[in-house]
From Swiss-Prot:
BP GO terms, sorted: cell volume homeostasis
Pfam families for the chain: CorC_HlyC, Na_H_Exchanger, TrkA_C
Segments forming domain RCK C-terminal: 403-485
Molecular functions (GO terms): flavin adenine dinucleotide binding; potassium:proton antiporter activity
Functional note: K(+)/H(+) antiporter that extrudes potassium in exchange for external protons and maintains the internal concentration of potassium under toxic levels.
Gene this protein is translated from: nhaP2
Name of the protein in its database record: K(+)/H(+) antiporter NhaP2
Matches recorded under Gene3D superfamilies: 1.20.1530.20, 3.30.465.10, Regulator of K+ conductance, C-terminal domain (3.30.70.1450)
PANTHER family associated with the record: K(+)_H(+) ANTIPORTER NHAP2, NA(+)/H(+) ANTIPORTER 1
Family the entry assigns: Belongs to the monovalent cation:proton antiporter 1 (CPA1) transporter (TC 2.A.36) family. NhaP2 subfamily.
Organism lineage string: Bacteria, Pseudomonadati, Pseudomonadota, Gammaproteobacteria, Enterobacterales
Length: 575
């Protein structure tokens, strides 16, 4: 490869990445998932597109995609709160194991019939497209404001269901290559190996990496590089040992993100850019790999297979997988069924048969790609609509314009939050002493226009003021309410109820006010929060609703695992 060729690659790569970034703004305007934009640009640059770039290097695509997935899952793990495991761990693991098997089996049987294949080859197609994709789920769920039970279940499922899909795919490829038609006891051994190595080495590697980062004295810019290189090392090591590198790197990130770590803010900020670059690069390469003309001959059966999986196989697997978990209501189960997003992982798995030289490998690849496109276009574009119809969107609290980590003490992660006050903020005209700031927070600076003011308690806030507040992450909900907009208060009332009650209120007092019909066995001296927990059972989350005694009770606020405020609304016939 000469210098001119290398420079041409740099030029083409830079143009494609820049075009992806610039055109990503059309995603929200058109209601199209941003991943589809990246895929489309790659396809336009490919053999059948305007660019005419001939790219059929499957090993290179496999390399780029796996590297990108490792970075995306490391970032996703760091941003997943360990508290979400309280409500979602076991349901997500059920979907990640039994759910994938059911989806793959049902989809594979229909694939064998639609494409006139042997049962085992049909099951291979089912295994390839059987898992949801972490990159797609993390990208499309971000900022949707779903209740914690649903969002955490979907995110943990997408980060942990790839081992089952990889295991099924590799096992079926080996069986087809060896001419076998039945499973042996080694099937279970390989499954345990995939999950076991992924969990053990992922957590051990994450712990060692955390220790190394906190012990080493480095330039601030090197900590993110150490974290990402360590995560990739964990991914590669587990994969080399025939474990699930995808699960390992996710758990590694989860451990890093939920323990005190040096330069946390810098690591997260760098990871954000790396994750975006990884998504762009991965979907560009996968788009280049596809020739749209190859999809036309299989379009009808592949579309039927996609609809079968989306409308029947995935919902059935979700309803079976969530049977033991009574805390999920019907609306949540239906929504989780709909968010069976497919993305890069099925396409990467479809490269395996190509590299193994199996018959019909091109068919497997094209079918997988078609299913991914249908999933992103059909499910991805309707995600917000489905969430609203299922009434799973919790009214958001105001987020700061920006947040900057101060990196003063890794055991106390102080940050600077910046809020800009527009005319619709209720606090306009209030004095600083009137603001009920969360305990431990301080207003560090107040900007008015280009001027830095020296405020006192009597300083009144004006439209356009910029407040710099020092606090910690757990202060964000209270700060968001403090600087909230008036319309959000009305939205909260529509969602949470006509009245928002303090959960510490005595049940006896609430009973007298609302005329509740309490059973004689009910302890009237308990608090409203304790009684609501009894009504819900399980692990409640903000937005959970239940009808009792002619009233709708909604959990409006929680502090850690404790219900702090409850919304009450009178049940009407219309509702």
């Amino acid at each position: 490869m000469d210098a001119i060729t290398i420079n041409s690659l740099f030029l083409v790569g830079a143009v494609l990445v820049a075009a992806s970034i610039l055109l990503s703004s059309f995603s929200s305007r058109l209601g199209i998932p941003i991943l589809v934009i990246f895929l489309a640009i790659g396809m336009l640059a490919g053999t059948d597109g305007l660019g005419g770039i001939a790219f059929d290097n499957y090993p290179a695509a496999y390399l780029v995609s796996n590297l990108a997935l490792a970075v995306i899952l490391l970032d996703g793990g760091m941003r997943t709160r360990a508290s979400s495991f309280r409500v979602a761990l076991w349901p997500a693991l059920s979907l990640a194991t039994f759910g994938v098997i059911i989806t793959a089996g049902l989809t594979g049987l229909v694939a064998a019939w639609l494409f006139n294949l042997d049962i085992i080859q049909g099951l291979l197609i089912g295994a390839i497209i059987g898992s949801t994709d972490a990159a797609a789920v993390f990208s499309l769920l971000g900022g949707k404001g779903l209740n914690e039970r649903v969002s955490a279940t979907l995110e943990i499922e997408s980060g942990s269901n790839d081992p089952m899909a990889v295991f099924l795919t590799v096992t079926l490829i080996a069986m087809i290559a060896a001419g076998e038609t039945s499973l042996s006891w080694m099937f279970l051994v390989h499954l345990i190996q995939q999950f076991g190595l992924g969990i053990i080495i992922g957590l051990l590697g994450g712990g060692l990496l955390l220790l190394l980062i906190n012990r080493m004295e480095l330039a601030n810019g090197l900590y993110p590089l150490l974290a990402v290189s360590g995560g990739i090392l964990v991914f590669a090591l587990v994969t080399a040992l025939n474990g699930s590198g995808i699960l390992a790197v996710y758990l590694c990130g989860l451990l890093l993100g939920n323990r005190p770590i040096r330069n946390r803010a810098g690591i997260l900020q760098t990871f954000d850019g790396l994750a975006w670059l990884s998504q762009i690069g991965m979907f560009l390469v996968l788009g280049l790999l596809l020739n749209p003309s190859d999809l036309l001959p299989i379009a009808i059966p592949a579309l039927l297979l996609s609809l079968w999986m989306i409308l029947f196989a995935r919902p059935l697997s979700v309803f079976i997988g969530l049977l033991p978990f009574r805390s999920f209501n019907l609306r949540e189960r239906v929504f989780i069924s709909w968010v069976g997003l497919r993305g890069a992982v099925p396409v990467i798995l479809a490269v395996f048969p190509m590299m193994a030289g199996l018959p019909n490998a091109n068919l497997f690849f094209n079918v997988a790609f078609f299913v991914v496109l249908v999933s992103l276009l059909l499910q991805g574009t309707t995600l917000s609509f489905a969430a609203r119809k299922a009434k799973l969107v919790v009214p958001p609290t105001l987020a700061p314009v920006s947040r900057i980590g101060l990196d003063i003490d890794m055991n106390n992660q102080w940050e600077q939050f910046i809020y800009q006050l527009s005319c619709d903020k209720w606090c306009i005209g209030a004095t600083l002493r009137d603001l009920k700031m969360p305990q431990g927070t301080r207003i560090a600076a107040l900007f008015r226009g280009k001027d830095l003011l020296h405020p006192t308690g009597s300083t009144r806030l004006k439209e356009g003021d910029i407040l710099c507040v020092i606090g910690q992450e757990h202060d964000l909900p209270a700060l968001g309410k403090l600087f909230s907009q008036s319309p959000n208060i009305q939205l909260d009332e529509r969602f949470f109820g006509d009245f928002i009650l303090d959960a510490d209120a005595k049940l006896q007092d609430i009973s007298q006010i609302y005329g509740l019909n309490l059973e004689p066995t009910v302890d009237k001296q308990q608090t409203l929060g304790q009684f609501v927990l009894y009504l819900f059972g399980g692990e409640p989350v903000i937005g959970d609703q239940i009808e009792w005694d002619g009233l709708t009770w909604t959990i409006a606020e929680m502090e850690s695992d404790r219900v702090s405020r409850v919304g009450v609304k009178i049940v009407t016939d219309k509702a």
